């Protein structure tokens, strides 16, 4: 069965998922494709494993940016695709292959249907961690090409193809990784009084962390602490000297994030005192909330509703994390959900976005960019 050019690009990218700042094959694929679009008004830069492309407009007054994240996840794929990942233990389970393909399609349209304003395409690495948006934004490579307006999208398995969803203001939460290492004194299981059990300490800590949200955050201001992984000990008859908790924090306000972290630190200090152990807290990667520019978002939604065949709906904010929030903190713009109608959700080994969405997204985004970037 013959597939369209951009569906094939998505499948090519799907086969080569790579984790943050190791997207060398993906970067080269993007560069090779851009090479086929060579024009005197197209400029290309690389930044780490990312790519930045500028299409110089005919009569520019501003720079419009489109950001696509390009990294995959450390997940073993279970889609059954003929074009499944060839990289063991890695998968495009968050749709970044689709995001990148749409970006390349939009770039292709921008070259063949040149507009007045400049366009900059940011093919950004490491969205899944440790975070590529902020360092790319602050890079010398982007300094002269920094957009005046920027947009981004994320696939949404729960919405039908042909539907987009977004809202003015807060869209995605503030997020932070959470790692807590406990160190005590190990020993023989028969002599617990001579040791200091870090599995017991970790168990108490997990239980106490459950009170942080329920008793310290306003019920109208949502927040989440999830401990997703606990490790500790070596064998069944040795008391554990060390244990490690790994999790995530998500809040809808910066103030709540500060409050939650403060309470975590107080509780951990209490565990140290109670169990006479040492504890180290590491917050890992932290992402700023995605806050859509009200006027630009409202204008975009009205345009999509009135001038395209896409269905646009107003959604509620989500506890999802996205480092695109750093870009929106400095540049007016917006992000939206793009429906892909998948039975399985994001970060699932069986995620299968409907590829029909690719051409639809390229078409309506090209319409919007031309409307926004041409003199009226």
From Swiss-Prot:
Pathway: Amino-acid biosynthesis; L-lysine biosynthesis via DAP pathway; LL-2,6-diaminopimelate from (S)-tetrahydrodipicolinate (acetylase route): step 3/3. Belongs to the peptidase M20A family. N-acetyldiaminopimelate deacetylase subfamily. The active site is at 69, 128 (proton acceptor). One of its GO terms (biological process) is lysine biosynthetic process via diaminopimelate. Catalyzes the conversion of N-acetyl-diaminopimelate to diaminopimelate and acetate. The lineage of its organism: Bacteria, Bacillati, Bacillota, Bacilli, Bacillales. Its EC number is 3.5.1.47. It catalyses: N-acetyl-(2S,6S)-2,6-diaminopimelate + H2O = (2S,6S)-2,6-diaminopimelate + acetate. This is N-acetyldiaminopimelate deacetylase. The keyword Cell cycle does not apply. Pfam families: M20_dimer (PF07687), Peptidase_M20 (PF01546). GO terms for molecular function: N-acetyldiaminopimelate deacetylase activity. InterPro entries: AcetylDAP_deacetylase (IPR023905), Amidohydrolase (IPR017439), Bact_exopeptidase_dim_dom (IPR036264), Peptidase_M20 (IPR002933), Peptidase_M20_dimer (IPR011650). Gene3D superfamilies: 3.30.70.360, Zn peptidases. Keywords: Amino-acid biosynthesis, Diaminopimelate biosynthesis, Hydrolase, Lysine biosynthesis.
């Amino acid at each position: 069965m013959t597939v369209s050019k951009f569906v094939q690009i998505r499948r090519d990218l799907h086969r080569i998922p790579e984790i943050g700042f190791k997207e060398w094959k993906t970067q080269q694929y993007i560069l090779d494709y851009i090479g086929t679009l060579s024009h005197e008004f197209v400029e290309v830069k690389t930044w780490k494993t990312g790519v930045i492309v500028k299409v110089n407009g005919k009569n520019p007054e501003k720079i419009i940016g489109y950001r696509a994240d390009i990294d995959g996840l450390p997940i073993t794929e279970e889609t059954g695709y003929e074009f499944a990942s060839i990289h063991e233990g890695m998968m495009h389970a968050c749709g970044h292959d689709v995001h990148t393909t749409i970006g390349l399609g939009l770039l292709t349209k921008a070259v063949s249907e040149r507009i007045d304003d400049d366009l900059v395409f940011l093919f950004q690495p490491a969205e899944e961690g440790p975070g590529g948006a902020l360092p790319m934004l602050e890079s010398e490579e982007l300094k002269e090409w920094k957009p005046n307006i920027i947009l981004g999208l994320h696939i949404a398995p729960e919405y039908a193809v042909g539907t987009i969803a977004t809202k003015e203001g807060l869209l995605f939460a503030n997020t932070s990784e959470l790692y807590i290492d406990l160190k005590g004194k190990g020993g023989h299981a028969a002599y617990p009084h001579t040791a200091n059990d870090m599995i017991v300490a970790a168990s108490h800590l997990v239980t106490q962390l459950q009170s942080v949200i329920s008793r310290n955050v306003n019920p109208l201001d949502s927040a989440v602490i999830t401990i997703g992984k606990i490790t500790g000990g070596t064998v069944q008859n040795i008391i554990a000297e060390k244990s490690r908790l790994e999790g995530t924090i998500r809040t809808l306000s910066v103030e709540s994030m500060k409050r939650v972290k403060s309470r975590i630190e107080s509780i951990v200090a209490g565990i140290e005192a109670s169990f006479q152990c040492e504890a180290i807290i590491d917050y890992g990667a932290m992402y700023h909330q995605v806050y859509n520019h009200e006027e630009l978002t409202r204008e975009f939604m009205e345009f999509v509703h009135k001038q395209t065949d896409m269905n646009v709906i107003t959604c509620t904010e989500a506890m999802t994390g996205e480092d695109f929030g750093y870009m929106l903190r400095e540049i007016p713009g917006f992000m939206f959900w793009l429906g892909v109608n998948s039975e399985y959700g994001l970060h699932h080994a069986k995620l299968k976005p409907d590829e029909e969405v690719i051409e639809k997204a390229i078409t309506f985004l090209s319409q919007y960019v031309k409307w926004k970037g041409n003199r009226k």
